[in-house]
Amino acid sequence: RSSSAASDVYKRQVQYLWEELKKNDDIYLSKYSGWYSVSDEAFYNEDEIEDLDNKKVAISSKSPVEWVDEESYFFRLSKWEKALLEFYEKNPDFISPASRKNEVISFVKSGLKDLSVSRKSFSWGIKVPNDDDHVIYVWLDALTNYISALNYPNKDDELFKKFWPASVHIIGKDILRFHAIYWPAFLLAAKITPPKKVYGHGWILSNEEKMSKSKGNILDPLEIIKQYGLDPLRYYLIKEVSFGNDGNISQERLEDCINSDLANNFGNLCQRVSAFVIKNCDSKVPEKIKFENDDIKILDEYSQNLDKLRSEIDNQNINYYIDYIVNRLFEANKYFNDQEPWKKKDDKIRSVSYTHLRAHETRY
């Protein structure tokens, strides 16, 4: 399908969702008067605005806002306040982490106002069906992407049945409201099951501040990858930033992490194990070895924790998993020193079994 054809299909999908909402009396025409941020593509209430350098800005993003006074279509968000709270209660894991969940529920309980879902002053965008003077609000348009790729509105399509509802939307905390309030409200109104979970991750900070060109504190990931490699950067971010919270990073801490965890801890263990495998096992990890009680305890402990570790990953607690692995590697190096296998020249079997155990640890 050509890009122009795909674009036409997508427009029809967005317009179909619009018509479904309108058919159910969830969209009506009225007049909007209030603050709007072009850069945030978001509407703000009066209590979400402040004065900064003689300008009106959004408190959350510091982006400039302008007063808008124009005809607009509205989505009856207030109508879905009770349904949303019931949905959150029936699906307690829908919003994570807990701090974000509390934030969203508190906002909904404070009272939802109907949401402006069209702009009359914009020339670009998808036209409102049967009203070319209006274009559909960008977030109603953009959120439809999640289901348009699954051939919505055909809910019997194999892609739609296989992948919807989505297991998780992982999004930035600054757009949590769109995904955890507006999106499920749109879907419930259109009789579509919302995703199973929305996870609002934090920001990556540099020197305790949000990165910006004006502050000159941006760390270019492409340059870092050139210097240190992609996997070390991934590892550092996962370990350093507790998922769901803001995380402060620096090049110095990246280097310390690579040296301590990947080189001195993991790398050292790999080098030691490889040397023993080459020397005692013809460069192959042995398959059948008789372990001693201390070895069996270690392997049993690993096996018993696998389900918990998988659960932590499923719940986006990836840094917990990383911490567990780092601690096990540290213990493996300590066990290596305590056992002193290099002194067991006359105990070939013990040397080989020890090598087998350590090799399993590096693969784990």
Residue ranges and their predicted role:
Residues 246-251, 304-310:
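Short, charged/polar, low-complexity loop and linker segments
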Residues 270, 313-323, 332, 357-358, ...:
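C-terminal amphipathic alpha-helical
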Residues 307-323, 339-354:
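Acidic, serine/threonine- and proline-rich low-complexity regulatory regions
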Residues 1-6, 10, 356-364:
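Single conserved hydrophobic/aromatic residue that forms the stacking wall/gate
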